[in-house]
Amino acid sequence: MKNIRNFSIIAHIDHGKSTLADRLIQECGAVSSREMSSQIMDTMDIEKERGITIKAQSVRLNYTLDGQNFVLNLIDTPGHVDFSYEVSRSLASCEGALLVVDASQGVEAQTIANVYIALENNLEIIPVINKIDLPAADPQRVKDEIEHVIGLDCSGAIEVSAKTGAGINELLEAIVRRVPAPDANDALPTKALIYDSWFDNYLGALALVRIYDGEIKKNDEVLVMGTNKKHIVLDLMYPHPIAPIKTARIGTGEVGIIVLGLKNVSDVQVGDTITLAKNPTKEPVGGFERAKPFVFAGIYPIETDKFEDLRDALDKLKLNDSSISYEPETSIALGFGFRVGFLGLLHMEVIKERLEREFDLDLIATAPTVTYEVVQTDGQILRIQNPSQLPAVNKIEMIKEPYVRSTIITPTEFLGNIITLLNNRRGVQTKMDYITPERVLLEYDIPMNEIVMDFYDKLKSSTKGYASFDYEPSDYREGDLVKLDIKVAGETVDALSIIVPESKAQSKGRDFVKAMKEIVPRQLFEVAIQASIGNKIIARETVKSMGKNVTAKCYGGDITRKRKLLEKQKEGKKRMKAIGKVNLPQEAFLSVLKID
């Protein structure tokens, strides 16, 4: 056991984490050069295309130093804010972490967020300055930044280039010498933390565990503490990026995959503890929170008869991603669908894309919302995720909305743009710190509702892509909020309702109806598009009717004949307007998402 090292890699997006992992795998000879593909740890196509890591992967490496054999378990972590939950549980399974920082970019917001998770778990952190082969690399400046912002001593920082392979051996040696061996006890009852689970078509639900005490052998009867169910261990494997390696036992301090032959991943929930049925441990592994969805959106199949297919697809995705939650809902405008909860916007995009790709569905997503707390006049408190659930105005005492604590790091020249953007989004500044004369760190409290739409895009475009952003949930605060409804031809379109601050309602309503006017197809009768708060209409646009030339067949003759035909047409249009229905195209829903 003293020769085991469990470590993970922490880095901001694009600082070269997956490439560094590839290099370590290659150096230890875990994968032959023929089988090596770039970003071998990123198994989903969508991960490789977007260049991000979504699911945490693991790999067991063998390394020899001074004639001794060591086992290095590399536990990969995603870098994006939405997946910080995956990060926290990956880090809970390690004793050490490599803090990878790009030698030309310096410290970014997510680097800081993940380092704090690592420090809370008391990990040994080794600073690694990557990409030293770049012409713009300035390792010394980056070391100073790490010391200033995070307060880590960088005298032992290791400079590497994952691309050329420089410094990789030195890094492996540092992992062995500086990361502590697992502190665990063979004699205690078995205790293992499930830090990932996924579904395999042949083997069923698999649990990736880190063993803290004791051991697990093939054919043992184990107890999953969260569900209190017993299962037989059918197989044990060590993780490997290409094909897992079978083993008869997994010992203390090790990382491995347990096959229990389960049909459902909810039986091996991430964060649960596995122990032996005959000698169970008293306490589960602590310090572990469930993922809570923050952003909710309605997802509907474009073809209404595909509802059951969508349910199956969500069930299957839930097997791999325990952080999504969903329940069926109906909309007058869109038919049957689901209200799905996500960790954030990127998570929502990725899930929607995976549903469309992997299950061949055509979907439409409504505007994302957050969970509001509504205090009613009778003292009852409602938690709502869908604007259409909001009670009548006269029953509402107040509406509270969730706030997030955000960290933004930006070059000083864009400071003005960012402060303007944050003030427009009702942000409250809590801290401002110059890391270097060129870069500044801002901390703001912002309503979650203001960042779920397009905040990230706006932030990037107002700083030419240089700012980095990270957030964590803070608390609920009272807000001056109203529900904005959109009516088309007098009927409220429930899927387009949103909750907005009263001060922005007027302008938001105007923008809404303008955008809708461009999209609603012209009918044979005129269509009014209105934005309303309660019964009060605050904005209106009209889509003009298409006219048929009813007088075309009259050649010359009496004017009264023409007038009679035009009057008849007018009557018909009136009748049509009273009973006519307008079918809204898909773009109508998407365009509303884009309105700032």
From Swiss-Prot:
<protein>
    <recommendedName>
        <fullName>Elongation factor 4</fullName>
        <ecNumber>3.6.5.n1</ecNumber>
    </recommendedName>
</protein>
<keyword id="KW-0472">Membrane</keyword>
<dbReference type="Pfam" id="PF00679">
    <property type="entry name" value="EFG_C"/>
</dbReference>
<feature type="binding site">
    <location>
        <begin position="130"/>
        <end position="133"/>
    </location>
    <ligand>
        <name>GTP</name>
    </ligand>
</feature>
<keyword id="KW-1003">Cell membrane</keyword>
<dbReference type="InterPro" id="IPR013842">
    <property type="entry name" value="LepA_CTD"/>
</dbReference>
<comment type="similarity">
    <text>Belongs to the TRAFAC class translation factor GTPase superfamily. Classic translation factor GTPase family. LepA subfamily.</text>
</comment>
<dbReference type="InterPro" id="IPR027417">
    <property type="entry name" value="P-loop_NTPase"/>
</dbReference>
<keyword id="KW-0547">Nucleotide-binding</keyword>
<dbReference type="InterPro" id="IPR000640">
    <property type="entry name" value="EFG_V-like"/>
</dbReference>
<dbReference type="InterPro" id="IPR000795">
    <property type="entry name" value="T_Tr_GTP-bd_dom"/>
</dbReference>
<dbReference type="Pfam" id="PF06421">
    <property type="entry name" value="LepA_C"/>
</dbReference>
<dbReference type="GO" id="GO:0005886">
    <property type="term" value="C:plasma membrane"/>
</dbReference>
<keyword id="KW-0378">Hydrolase</keyword>
<keyword id="KW-0997">Cell inner membrane</keyword>
<dbReference type="InterPro" id="IPR005225">
    <property type="entry name" value="Small_GTP-bd"/>
</dbReference>
<dbReference type="Pfam" id="PF03144">
    <property type="entry name" value="GTP_EFTU_D2"/>
</dbReference>
<dbReference type="Pfam" id="PF00009">
    <property type="entry name" value="GTP_EFTU"/>
</dbReference>
<feature type="binding site">
    <location>
        <begin position="14"/>
        <end position="19"/>
    </location>
    <ligand>
        <name>GTP</name>
    </ligand>
</feature>
<dbReference type="InterPro" id="IPR038363">
    <property type="entry name" value="LepA_C_sf"/>
</dbReference>
<dbReference type="InterPro" id="IPR035654">
    <property type="entry name" value="LepA_IV"/>
</dbReference>
<keyword id="KW-0342">GTP-binding</keyword>
<dbReference type="GO" id="GO:0003924">
    <property type="term" value="F:GTPase activity"/>
</dbReference>
<keyword id="KW-0648">Protein biosynthesis</keyword>
<dbReference type="InterPro" id="IPR004161">
    <property type="entry name" value="EFTu-like_2"/>
</dbReference>
<feature type="domain" description="tr-type G">
    <location>
        <begin position="2"/>
        <end position="183"/>
    </location>
</feature>
<dbReference type="GO" id="GO:0003746">
    <property type="term" value="F:translation elongation factor activity"/>
</dbReference>
<dbReference type="InterPro" id="IPR006297">
    <property type="entry name" value="EF-4"/>
</dbReference>
<dbReference type="GO" id="GO:0045727">
    <property type="term" value="P:positive regulation of translation"/>
</dbReference>
<dbReference type="GO" id="GO:0005525">
    <property type="term" value="F:GTP binding"/>
</dbReference>
<comment type="function">
    <text>Required for accurate and efficient protein synthesis under certain stress conditions. May act as a fidelity factor of the translation reaction, by catalyzing a one-codon backward translocation of tRNAs on improperly translocated ribosomes. Back-translocation proceeds from a post-translocation (POST) complex to a pre-translocation (PRE) complex, thus giving elongation factor G a second chance to translocate the tRNAs correctly. Binds to ribosomes in a GTP-dependent manner.</text>
</comment>
<dbReference type="InterPro" id="IPR031157">
    <property type="entry name" value="G_TR_CS"/>
</dbReference>
<dbReference type="GO" id="GO:0043022">
    <property type="term" value="F:ribosome binding"/>
</dbReference>
<dbReference type="InterPro" id="IPR035647">
    <property type="entry name" value="EFG_III/V"/>
</dbReference>
